[in-house]
Amino acid sequence: MGSSMATGNRLKPRAPFTRALFLTVFCLVLFIYTLRPSSIERPAQVQPQRNPMLNGSHVHMSDCTINKSQLEDLQDRYELGDEIEFARRYVRFHRQDIDRKPMTKIDMDLFPRGFDEIDIRNPPRRTTCLKPLEVPVPRSRTPNTVDASDLLFGISTTYSRLTDEEISPIKEWAHWLTDGNGKSNGAGLVLRLIDATVEELEETQAKMTDMGIDVKVYPTDSSIEMAKRYLSLLPALYNDTSRESRKFLVMCDDDTFYPSMHNLLDRLSQYDYRTDLYIGTLSEDVNNIQRHGSQAFGGAGVFFSIPLAEKVADKFDQCSTAEKIEEANTGWGPQGDILLRKCIHEHTETTLTLLRELHQLDIQGDPAGFYEGGLSPLSLHHFKGGMWHKARPYEGAQVIHACGEDCFLQRFQTADDFIISNGFSIAYYPKGIDFNIHQIEKTFTAAPDDYGWNLDFMLGPQRKNLLWTGRKVAWELMEAQVQKDGSVKQTYIRKTDDYRWTYGEGGNRMFEKDGVLELVWISS
Ligand SMILES: *[C@@H]1O[C@H](CO)[C@@H](O)[C@H](O)[C@H]1NC(C)=O
Ligand SMILES: *[C@@H]1O[C@H](CO)[C@@H](O)[C@H](O)[C@H]1NC(C)=O
Ligand SMILES: *[C@@H]1O[C@H](CO)[C@@H](O)[C@H](O)[C@H]1NC(C)=O
């Protein structure tokens, strides 16, 4: 039944306490613990749990078995040590007529029995078996009911990026272009592949069509100046035969991700698509706005109404002369976003309509503060590492297939000082949650110059980060699977050598072993 508290591993980071103090606290905790109503399943009840609300097809089992080969696979993928700390918790969500709160407090412990100490070479057959954690969630919709036929997207990229195992965006595109079951959600995609061969175009077309993506793949030519190529995508979208049935033409980067299409469409429906509209967002970094101008930063997604797209298409030649391209160079090479803004400003009365839930994410370093901020982003960008940050929003967003769009990045605070940022992390605060949860933790930096306040206008002033303080440790989501019964299993991992979880910068590690936490989201 896993390790009990007697092994002293109950959520205990290695702290420089004296043994006496430790024992006193330990005995106190043990005493209080015996008085609490237990959320632990008695061994006799370690059986499939039947929820009377469910009919036969949706019975969820609390599976407390440990599968050695699955642990070995995780060990391989994430270079885990042989001895790990492990815990699994089922989370039963209850859809209610409530708003999505910045923080949902749950009056239960997340891991009342701490973690099991497991040797992957010889694991126990079962893990500590707990009753599901019960959490309320708003009634939000799932991808299988999206009708996005109002939208036609345009992206330029290269065949080599599409086929790169590390950064290929195709499965992410399928998230926002299909119903999650291999069928188009109605949205179209015009994909331009730079310098691709006929075979590459055909292969891409076939592969993406197979995945249910309504795509038209075209070649484009690297000899055309990049900024001009970018601008020419809008007339190409405007020219598409499906235009008549669209309301918005959307340009974005190959690393733009739209987690929640219902929410995106709801927001867009607040605007009158028959008027001239240029909708997008600024960079979070005022430094970039000063450098490049007040315009839509394309990685967050830029939405054009058809009437405005028509005007840009008409003026394409005038807007893309050598002189205009030179004017779009702010010292970082000619920028497509600038060429587009100038074309709109110089030929129409339209300026940017700011949709702040879109995110360019010009941030570097540890992005946790953003993803743990309780936000409900309509787009995400720059999350593939390299010079920007690294995150896994595709894996994170899988949970919406079970509990609806609002669940992604929704926060739950449990009685034992954990905060689940659903689909990003499970963070534990050993000294309590004594900070302003409404502010974003400044774990990241602006680039290339961080004045300390560049990001404040868009993200709000951020609170001081808790790195190297011993006050925070987080397991981050690495994978997630929608399972046959409709539940979603998430795997969160904390490595012992993570540079962030130490006492003092470069100081002693808070934990001696790697940690794996699993959450399984089941419906009520
Ligand atoms: C069982 O539940 C599923 C999903 O809620 C529903 O589609 C199905 O009709 C239900 N079957 C019965 C027998 O109630
Ligand atoms: C354990 O997991 C593997 C996949 O890693 C799977 O093939 C196997 O069926 C699982 N075994 C049991 C008993 O569930
Ligand atoms: C759009 O169609 C017009 C008319 O058929 C054509 O002249 C123009 O080159 C096309 N533009 C693009 C970018 O495909």
Kindly give the residue locations of the regions a language model identified:
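Extended non-globular C-terminal regions
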Residues: 2, 6-18, 416-524
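N-terminal signal-anchor transmembrane helix specifying type II single-pass membrane topology
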Residues: 2-97, 492, 497
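Conserved catalytic core of nucleotide-sugar-dependent glycosyltransferases
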Residues: 15, 256-347, 355-364, 373-375, ...
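Long, contiguous juxta-domain segments that are non-catalytic but functionally important
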Residues: 63-182
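Active-site-proximal specificity loops/subdomain of glycosyltransferases
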Residues: 190-248, 257-262
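Active-site acidic Asp-centered loop
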Residues: 252-254
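PAPS-dependent sulfotransferase catalytic core
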Residues: 350-402, 406
